Amino acid sequence: MDDVATMKSENANLRKIQSRLLQWEQKDNPLAPLSSAQNEFINRLADSLTGATSPGANPLMESQELSLECKTTLVDFKNSGSVIDSTQDFLSWYNSIDSEILEHYDDVYLDYYGQLKQRSVECDKLLEEIDVSLESLQKLTNEYKFVSEKTSSLHQASENLLQDQTKLNEIGEEIRRRLKYFSQAESIYQRLQNPTFSVSNDTFVEILNTIDECLEYMRVNPGFSEAFAYGVKYRNCLSKATQMMRNYVSNILTNATAQILGPQRSETGMEQGSEAAFALYYGKFQASAPRVKRITGMIEGRLDRSVEYEQLLAALHQQFLANRATIMSSGVEQAIRDLSKKHKGDHCALVRSACAFMVHVCQDEHRLFFQFFTNSSPQLTAYMEGLCTILYDTLRPFIIRIDHLETLAEICSILRVEMLDEHVTYNPESLEAFAKIVYQLLQDVQERIGFRAQNYLESDILNYRPSAGDLAYPEKLEMMESIALSLQENYLRRADSRSSIVSMTSLASQEVESINQQAEQASKSRASNSPADLHGMWYPTVRRTLVCLSRLYRCIDRAIFQSLSQQALAYCIQSVSNAAAQISQKKTSIDGELFEIKHLLILREQIAPFRVDFTVKETSLDFSKVKTAAFELLQKRKQLFALGSNNALLEFLLDGTPQVKEQLLDSRKDVDRQLKMVCEMFIKDATRQLVGPILNFIDTAQNHVKQSAASGSSQPGAKQQQQQGLALRMAAFAAPQQISSIIQESIRNIKTKLGALQRSMQLYLANKDTEFILFRPIRNNIIGSFVKLEQLLTTNSYSKDDLTVVSCPSAEQISVLLSSVNLSGTVGAEPFGGIQRKISASSMGGNGGASVKPPIEKKVSFDSGANTVVQIEAGSEAVEVSAEEASVEEALEGKIEAE
């Protein structure tokens, strides 16, 4: 099998070789195609071979022919009739035949030899021809090399010539390019000198570009010959061109200005919103804007090339704005003057209309400027400030003469809110100059407000002289309450009459009844408010202070407001205190104190919404040490020039330096402090009004006991204690009958005066939580006075019979009495008797006569986070009450939380 496979593969290879050999000599697409020269050479060789082989034939063919000839000879011999009779004949014939055969046999070789010889000669000739051809080829090769060398050298020389030509062309082009910057000066200058040449011509831009390029070239190449001279020429050309542009723009602006300032201007006033005025003052300039904008655009695009363009643009800005100032100044001044006449007496309307007019003028001028120019200019802001200064010069005399704070506050609001916040915020670029002038006006208004506010605070608050009606308390409150009750009754009667018309059985009647009930409850809740809560019932200085602060809050800066608010609140507190003192003189101290408490609460409540710190830092110098140091210096005169550490002068300089003291003044704390003090006074006066006899007796008894103890200090210890215990009992004013009468008098005061006190508190305060907070320490002081009296009697040898005669009520009995004796049965959210106390003489016996403090402490949460505990003195009894409860503001908000 392997042999068969091998044979197959060999046969396949042979076939492949044969096919490839056949493909060598294919006429179409041979494997080794010959060139035309090669084919011609082969054909020539084939022809020469064909000619050489044609005379002779192949030796084998000749031998065959020879054999044929021999056969022919034998045949001819047979046919010739020759007779061989003898051996001699045969031998002769044979020899002849043999000779012929030999001859014929040698002829073949001779012929072949001759052919070979001929071929040798031909080969020699061919070799000679080949040698000749080789010589010719060698000669041709040498000649080709020679020609190639010559051609290469010629080509290299041509390339060198071309390079030299290119280099020379480049040098010539560079020379022409450089000479271009020098050769155009005269032609440009002649064209600029041509009177018919205009700036509006299209070639003017090309001339400007050429001048800029030439100047830049001279600047970059200062070492070139005559570069400085040609730079001067081109600068002269540039000056001529800029002068032409300046004259061109100036003529356009001057013509537009002359047309506006013509006779038709007097017929058209510059009124706000006038279309004719806008067309007159802006139409001519807007029509000229495209021609000027083309020139200014070229200038603005070349600002970085030369200083002349910057100077030219600044001159054009100045020319444009000067023409606009000539047109607008008198017009704006006349328009504002007309507005001042139109709004004479109404300063707010004048400020609003004049500022609105200037806003439109500034926006129009800004828009017109950018129709002529692309970039802004500081001169535009200065020009706009000049126009707005007319507004400032017109309005400032009115502002500095305004005395009314509300008018000044309204003007301040107009300038700050309407102008700065609304207009300037949304158009900051066009209204930049207007904003500066308005800010100056605002500062003037604020300064005027501060000055007038100080005068107002001094004249109308601090030095306010109340009329009889202002101090008619509580008559005013009672009258307003009666009016409110009458209005409430009328409202209820009308509601009852309306509800009686509708049938009570229908669904509609039930709805009407529910509505009437809700209205009745609402009317009752409204009627429960005190007339003192009405804005018109506030004391005038309180109302004026709050109105003044509300006006100033949004008008002036925070630092100025803090200073003025500190002064205003101090003056208001002093004014309210003076009014309360006058009410106390005319009526009672309770009325004066309740009046002051109510208005201080109003003041504290109304200043709470102001989101500003009412704290003001005051800096002062303390010279107290200077006096001491000077005195020591006089005592140490001998040590003035001492060289040691005891130099008196040095000590004076060190110790006598004034100290800088900083003090924080908080208006809110001043109000709280004054409110706390007034509440303490009210609690003290109310307590003395109800249990004054008991408090006076306790003070007298304690003084008597102290005097007895001082006089009996020389006695023995036991006897001294016995005499001290009997000293009060033996005194005439401390007899049980006298003490009993004092107690009865105090109880009568409680029964007769407590209702009036609660009535006054309800009338003035009109807040049950506030009334409850104020009444609680009074209640505790009353109970504490009876408890203290009981302790005093127990510790000073009063017998049970004496105590029976005295009949001092216990704390529970006084609590029940206070709860039963009130105006409406409840004060505050719960009855006054809701606070439970269990204090009696027996319960105090285990305390060794120590003073018992009623459990009345409460905790109140404040926004400020302060929980300071203060002492409110009422008689001789000290009761702890938080400062927040004394200020009672958080009680009004219902944030009281029992501890």
UniProtKB/Swiss-Prot annotation:
<dbReference type="Pfam" id="PF20671">
    <property type="entry name" value="COG3_C"/>
</dbReference>
<protein>
    <recommendedName>
        <fullName>Conserved oligomeric Golgi complex subunit 3</fullName>
    </recommendedName>
</protein>
<comment type="function">
    <text>Involved in ER-Golgi transport.</text>
</comment>
<dbReference type="GO" id="GO:0017119">
    <property type="term" value="C:Golgi transport complex"/>
</dbReference>
<keyword id="KW-0472">Membrane</keyword>
<comment type="similarity">
    <text>Belongs to the COG3 family.</text>
</comment>
<dbReference type="GO" id="GO:0000139">
    <property type="term" value="C:Golgi membrane"/>
</dbReference>
<keyword id="KW-0653">Protein transport</keyword>
<keyword id="KW-0813">Transport</keyword>
<dbReference type="GO" id="GO:0007030">
    <property type="term" value="P:Golgi organization"/>
</dbReference>
<dbReference type="InterPro" id="IPR048685">
    <property type="entry name" value="COG3_C"/>
</dbReference>
<dbReference type="Pfam" id="PF04136">
    <property type="entry name" value="COG3_N"/>
</dbReference>
<keyword id="KW-0333">Golgi apparatus</keyword>
<dbReference type="GO" id="GO:0005801">
    <property type="term" value="C:cis-Golgi network"/>
</dbReference>
<dbReference type="InterPro" id="IPR048320">
    <property type="entry name" value="COG3_N"/>
</dbReference>
<dbReference type="GO" id="GO:0006886">
    <property type="term" value="P:intracellular protein transport"/>
</dbReference>
<dbReference type="GO" id="GO:0006891">
    <property type="term" value="P:intra-Golgi vesicle-mediated transport"/>
</dbReference>
<dbReference type="InterPro" id="IPR007265">
    <property type="entry name" value="COG_su3"/>
</dbReference>
<dbReference type="GO" id="GO:0006888">
    <property type="term" value="P:endoplasmic reticulum to Golgi vesicle-mediated transport"/>
</dbReference>
<comment type="subunit">
    <text>Component of the conserved oligomeric Golgi complex which is composed of eight different subunits and is required for normal Golgi morphology and localization.</text>
</comment>
